[in-house]
Structures are given as structure tokens and as C-alpha cells.
């Protein structure tokens, strides 16, 4: 049984309003998948962008594999995402017409050891929206604390 890896983009839910979620496969080299299985990746500042009809994740950081030597990959290269044609067309339409953004939420390996990326169609939050999120979270925490006392 393979150990599953789960790398999160923790700021995504705070900075964006998530509209829709998708799970995409990734085109990776051998040293990239080995680094991901070791948990040496970061998707905190990454985003997705269309180049033609294909979707790429940009600015994701996958550390070089320690034993890769001359065949190692570039840590910040663009990586192609694999989705159904129908899903790609829908995402492209939403990004072009509605001005939405696609960001990665989670990088993980499934039970077969394949690397997958959970992406989300999002709308950026304004500063006052972020303040509301903080207030709501604090109010919920206070209510839970009061309920626990009784």
C-alpha cells in the first residue's frame, strides 16, 4: 500500500470565493513524481492558465529530487493538467466571459500513486469580504464556546 500525500493551498479559501471544483491529472516527469511522493512540493502561490486549448498550472514549486542528478527537473516549470474536453471548454468559457480565476486547492496522490490536483473556479475576494469572513469565523467560534459551557 502506498502512502498518500496531501499538500494544501491554505490561503485559497481566505483569498477567493470558490464557485466550482474539479480534479485534474498532471503530466509529470519521473523525478517530479518522486519529489511529490516525498511531500516536497508547494502550491501556495500557483495559479492555472490556458495556453491555447490546454490548461497549465504555473508557479507551482516541486523541489528537485535528491537522487535525480543530471535528469532532474526545473522546480518552477509549467505543468500540463489533464481534464475532459467538456470540462476544459466550460472552464475556458467561464474564465473568458465571467473573469474568474482557476487556482489549485490540493495536490495529492491517489491509491494508485498517481499525482492529482484539485482545482477550483474562483472569484477573488475584496478586503471587506475577507474581514467579513474573519468576523463570521470568530462569531462561530464564540457560539461554539458558549454552547460547550451549557
UniProtKB/Swiss-Prot annotation:
- An example of a Pfam family matching this protein is SmpB
Q: Name one GO molecular function term.
A: RNA binding
Q: Does the entry annotate any disulfide bonds, and if so which pairs?
A: none
Q: Quick one: where is this thing mainly located?
A: cytoplasm
Q: Where in the cell is it found?
A: Cytoplasm
Q: Name one GO biological process term.
A: trans-translation
**Signal sequence bounds:** none
Cellular component aspect of the GO annotation: cytosol
What job does this protein perform? Required for rescue of stalled ribosomes mediated by trans-translation. Binds to transfer-messenger RNA (tmRNA), required for stable association of tmRNA with ribosomes. tmRNA and SmpB together mimic tRNA shape, replacing the anticodon stem-loop with SmpB. tmRNA is encoded by the ssrA gene; the 2 termini fold to resemble tRNA(Ala) and it encodes a 'tag peptide', a short internal open reading frame. During trans-translation Ala-aminoacylated tmRNA acts like a tRNA, entering the A-site of stalled ribosomes, displacing the stalled mRNA.
Return the similarity comment: Belongs to the SmpB family.
Protein name, please?
SsrA-binding protein
Q: What is the lineage of its organism?
A: Bacteria, Pseudomonadati, Bacteroidota, Flavobacteriia, Flavobacteriales
Which gene is the coding source of this polypeptide chain? smpB
